[in-house]
Amino acid sequence: MALKIRLRQQGRRNHVVYRLVLADVESPRDGKYIELLGWYDPHSSINYQLKSERIFYWLERGAQLSSKAEALVKQGAPGVYSALLSKQEARKLVVRKKRRAYRQRRSTQREEAAKDATK
């Protein structure tokens, strides 16, 4: 079950309000959701309210952000977004180190095989 943090449309005609929810990828836009993570009202002076701790919790567990939800989290909870980015960068560094070590092992094995073949 893939999870996504996305906006769910609410409100009435000409005054749409959105809820930031955690939902299954296959559920409809305005359908069933797992957890309410905040809201966004583009017409109000107080535009949004987000539950930063819960957003971070679900992002750590593998939930993905939709593009609009990502923009809202960047604006409303920059600490959560920067922590997520730093975690992703740390993972990339680990993968790069492993890849470098693997390439180095392979090149030394090839060199040794070439030396053995010439003997």
From Swiss-Prot:
Alphabetized InterPro entries for the sequence: Ribosomal_bS16, Ribosomal_bS16_dom_sf
Gene Ontology annotations of biological process type: translation
SUPFAM superfamilies: Ribosomal protein S16
GO cellular component: cytoplasm; small ribosomal subunit
Basic residues: compositionally biased ranges: 96-107
Keywords assigned: Ribonucleoprotein, Ribosomal protein
GO molecular function: structural constituent of ribosome
Bias-annotated ranges (Basic and acidic residues): 108-119
Pfam families to which the protein is assigned, alphabetical: Ribosomal_S16
Region (Disordered): 96-119
Membership in a protein family: Belongs to the bacterial ribosomal protein bS16 family.
Protein's recorded name: Small ribosomal subunit protein bS16
